[in-house]
Amino acid sequence: MQHLKELTEKARSALDALDQGLDALEEFRVEYFGKKGHFTALMQELRNVAAEERPAIGAKINEAKQTILDILNAKKEAWEQEALNAKLAAESIDVSLPGRKTELGGLHPVSITIERVVKFFSELGFTVASGPEIETDYYNFDALNIPAHHPARADHDTFWFDAQRLLRTQTSGVQIRTMENMQPPIRIVAPGRVYRNDYDQTHTPMFHQIELLYVDKKANFTELKGLIHDFLKAFFEEDLQVRFRPSFFPFTEPSAEVDVMRQNGKWLEVLGCGMVHPNVLRNVGIDPEEYSGFAVGMGVERLTMLRYNVTDLRSFFENDLRFLKQFK
């Protein structure tokens, strides 16, 4: 016990004699409390003490040890605070300087267009639908009245995995899956990625389409025309001159392509549409004598290019921030 008292007084004196310096405090801690420190050695000597005396002596050693540690930690905390205060005092901070500008992200222009289109049709009661991007030839071609000899099946247009599976070339397969699982009336808008083996200024191997499908007992071409007029006026935010040109799509009859008159006096195609072909309705178990429907298909990148006067479709996928930041 006498040795414990002497060790405690020695430790107190050593702490009091320390000049300011965190390194010196660490050396003191190692000397007294490290693996080979004085207090550690004292605890190890307890094995030489009679068993009945060990608890009392051990408690006194721990009490003395804790006292020194409290002084050590208090001194360390005070010195760390002094060092921090000195560092802050030495730093010059001009609080009048403007803060760092927060960089704000923004939606991709293609995403902006998809949101605008979906919002317009959702407000008219259309439900958003989706389907797989890896499709079977049945949903991508057969069910849509596209026969085996149709050019769209050729290798130069379609990415095939095998004789039955492919990357979908259109979102029309969503229409088939929806009609198989729902009874009329049906109103859906189906945005999604599609794939075709083409790459130039106006084509990319992956692009986005949005398709509409409306099936009911009295769906007609007049409704279709009115819907498209209202949509184009809302999307381009101007009262555009619109024309419908007769066209051919295997899955609609009659079919039309829709053009808008631009400021340069030229007509530009924006989408395709038509009344759902009776064969397509039969393929999904809907009686074409009782129900009719119309469908609309539009390329998202095409609409985006027209709205923002972009000349090269590939710009949307090059991740050039100088280009993308214009659409925030």
From Swiss-Prot:
Assembly mode: Tetramer of two alpha and two beta subunits.
Localization, UniProt: Cytoplasm
Cofactor: Mg(2+)
Domain of life of the organism encoding this protein: Bacteria
Catalytic activity: tRNA(Phe) + L-phenylalanine + ATP = L-phenylalanyl-tRNA(Phe) + AMP + diphosphate + H(+)
UniProt GO molecular function: ATP binding; magnesium ion binding; phenylalanine-tRNA ligase activity; tRNA binding
Keywords annotated in UniProt: Aminoacyl-tRNA synthetase, ATP-binding, Cytoplasm, Ligase, Magnesium, Metal-binding, Nucleotide-binding, Protein biosynthesis
Residues at which Mg(2+) binds: E253
Record's keyword annotation contains Cytoplasm: yes
Enzyme Commission number(s): 6.1.1.20
Name of this protein: Phenylalanine--tRNA ligase alpha subunit
